[in-house]
Amino acid sequence: MNGVEQTCASLRTQIAATEAKLADLKRELEIAEQAAASHKQNAADAEGGSERRWPLLDEEYRRYGRQMIVPQLGIQGQLKLRSAKVLIVGAGGLGCPAALYLAGAGVGTLGLVDGDAVESSNLHRQVLHRTRNIGKLKVDSAIEYLKELNPHSKYIAHREHLAPEAAPEIFSNYDLILDCTDNPATRYLISDTAVLLGKPLVSASALRTEGQLMVLNNPPRPAGDKTGGPCYRCVFPKPPPANTVTSCADGGIVGPVVGTMGVLQALEAIKVITADETTTPPPPSLHIFSAYSTPLFRTIKLRSRRPNCAVCSAEASVTVDTVRSGSTDYIFFCGTTGPENLLSPEERITPLEYRTRHHDKEEKEPTIIDVREKVQYDICSLENSINIPISTILASASSSMSNGDSLADGVPALPSWVPPDVASSQSTDPVYVVCRLGNDSQVAVKKLKELGLDQGGKRVVADIRGGFRAWKEQVDPEWPEY
């Protein structure tokens, strides 16, 4: 880059920084002016020496008027919203739209719990965060946006991951809880704490193109009271096996899908807050959203509280003390989902070791089997690699076991997906298996060896440790990270 180009680049950088600073100042001025107007209105009311003529500020009538004229809300509903205290656990794909609409609706106090920082991979779906806030704590990024949207509400940041020892104290300051998290252990913790402290809970989840929504512990009743709403344990007495739990990072998520579920959480929260106290809440239901189905929504009626529930039945064993002390171990209850070493060190090779061993060699290239699903393989792939999705491998293995297929000598029959070069009993060329993170590839190696493709130890069948994430770090910095 020559001197003129450097000057241009420097000027562009300075202009961008100045424009960003100007935008920040404009936002600060707007918030200050709105706060000044509210302060002026409050001062005028106090100076009058009498009670306010109207329960809301002039600006609040203008701001919330369009929803106050809806019969289901009205002025009483708006006053309930203004006095409500709502806690949102998780400031991600669910928490962002939920917080956005609750703040817009005029909820008086919004608390946000999250210990994560904003990453670029969040931005396609977590709509409160902006590019310039990458690296900033999510709760601070979200509250920054919410204050611009509605300076009349109070926002409380809990800059931490929800932990059992802190959950009861945090929850006690709020009227309603929203579960916007994405892992089973935290879901059970949130539900247990909400039930024990008598807080209604709006819970949602989303993955790929589908989502689920429930309103739990509504109405909130003491343990043993059958008229209370069911809790998360009533619906799911046993957590799913840890190895079946898929995160958005692994399974993917369409932004509007998780956005839809977050908006529905906000809607259900508003319904709970503004409900007539003399009206019985609707029966508990599980609402299932599927973006590529017709109809989009299905509703399943849920049972009432389970008679033997560990939290909300008369025989409850979970208490505030067991939660706070750690006696109720949620990690143990749900199991861990961390990566496992299924193979011995001799059956694994790092990307750097692979490159050193086989790069620029005149001998035949080893076979690389990429076990990512085709949709990921189409994003990026190694030259001359073979795509055999892990789902195909596992499905054929299950089918072979059920059919008892085998050759005359007892060796399992080879599935049709095995490449001819790999299937050949004459070949001893090494076979390496790779995936995104280095977990599925280990499973695939075990299956290949069960099929006898390692020729009784004569052929190397190994996993590339750490998958393509490690490949990017050790071999190819330009490898797409998704």
Curated annotation (Swiss-Prot):
Cofactor(s) needed for function: Zn(2+)
The reply on keyword Transferase is yes
User: Where mainly located?
Assistant: cytoplasm
GO terms under cellular component:
cytosol
Which residues fall in a coiled-coil region? none
Keyword line: ATP-binding, Cytoplasm, Metal-binding, Molybdenum cofactor biosynthesis, Multifunctional enzyme, Nucleotide-binding, Nucleotidyltransferase, Transferase, tRNA processing, Ubl conjugation pathway, Zinc
* Reactions mediated catalytically: [molybdopterin-synthase sulfur-carrier protein]-C-terminal Gly-Gly + ATP + H(+) = [molybdopterin-synthase sulfur-carrier protein]-C-terminal Gly-Gly-AMP + diphosphate; [molybdopterin-synthase sulfur-carrier protein]-C-terminal Gly-Gly-AMP + S-sulfanyl-L-cysteinyl-[cysteine desulfurase] + AH2 = [molybdopterin-synthase sulfur-carrier protein]-C-terminal-Gly-aminoethanethioate + L-cysteinyl-[cysteine desulfurase] + A + AMP + 2 H(+)
Amino-acid positions noted as binding Zn(2+) in the UniProt annotation, renumbered to this chain: 231, 234, 309, 312
Which top class of enzyme applies to this chain? transferase
Q: Where in the cell is it found?
A: Cytoplasm, Cytosol
Q: Name one GO molecular function term.
A: thiosulfate-cyanide sulfurtransferase activity
Indicate the residues that form the catalytic site: 248, 435
Could you identify this protein by its name? Adenylyltransferase and sulfurtransferase uba4
Q: Ranges for the Rhodanese domain?
A: 362-480
Species of origin reads Aspergillus niger (strain ATCC MYA-4892 / CBS 513.88 / FGSC A1513)
Q: Name one Pfam family in it.
A: Rhodanese
Say yes or no: keyword Zinc present.
Answer: yes
Q: Which family does it belong to?
A: In the N-terminal section; belongs to the HesA/MoeB/ThiF family. UBA4 subfamily.
Q: How is the cofactor bound?
A: Binds 1 zinc ion per subunit.
Q: What does this protein do?
A: Plays a central role in 2-thiolation of mcm(5)S(2)U at tRNA wobble positions of cytosolic tRNA(Lys), tRNA(Glu) and tRNA(Gln). Also essential during biosynthesis of the molybdenum cofactor. Acts by mediating the C-terminal thiocarboxylation of sulfur carriers urm1 and mocs2a. Its N-terminus first activates urm1 and mocs2a as acyl-adenylates (-COAMP), then the persulfide sulfur on the catalytic cysteine is transferred to urm1 and mocs2a to form thiocarboxylation (-COSH) of their C-terminus.
